[in-house]
Amino acid sequence: MYAVFQSGGKQHRVSEGQVVRLEKLEVATGEKVEFDSVLMVVNGEDVKIGTPVVAGGKVVAEVVAHGRGEKVRIVKFRRRKHSRKQQGHRQWFTEVKITGIQA
């Protein structure tokens, strides 16, 4: 059984027991989170596709950790001008473990 849900402007395909990195959520570590915007649920041959969301669909997860991703380097370089600009960015994320899928 797996589900596709939306969080942080992105869609994630998950199954129970899976650990997923999402955009940062303002929830403490160890707390439960419920995602109501379930777009699709598949249980064997039974496929439920939402228009746009599945009625009564819910993905329940537990927050495992918060952190920051790998550094992305942004470089702006102008040739022949002796000009260079560097910048870095590390995006915050929340790691959750999927504990239940309901349809």
UniProtKB/Swiss-Prot annotation:
Record-level GO cellular component terms? cytoplasm; ribonucleoprotein complex; ribosome
Keyword hit for Iron-sulfur:
no
Q: Which PROSITE patterns match?
A: RIBOSOMAL_L21 (PS01169)
* UniProt keyword annotations, A-Z: Ribonucleoprotein, Ribosomal protein, RNA-binding, rRNA-binding
GO MF annotations for this entry? rRNA binding; structural constituent of ribosome
Q: Where are the transmembrane segments?
A: none
Recorded hits in InterPro entries, A to Z, give: bL21-like (IPR028909), bL21-like_sf (IPR036164), Ribosomal_bL21 (IPR001787), Ribosomal_bL21_CS (IPR018258)
Question: Which Pfam families does the annotation name?
Answer: Ribosomal_L21p
Q: Which GO terms describe its biological process?
A: translation
HAMAP family named in the record:
Ribosomal_bL21 (MF_01363)
Family recorded in the similarity comment: Belongs to the bacterial ribosomal protein bL21 family.
Q: How is the subunit organization of this protein annotated in UniProt?
A: Part of the 50S ribosomal subunit. Contacts protein L20.
Quote the function comment for this protein: This protein binds to 23S rRNA in the presence of protein L20.
Can you say what this protein is called? Large ribosomal subunit protein bL21
Gene this chain is encoded by = rplU
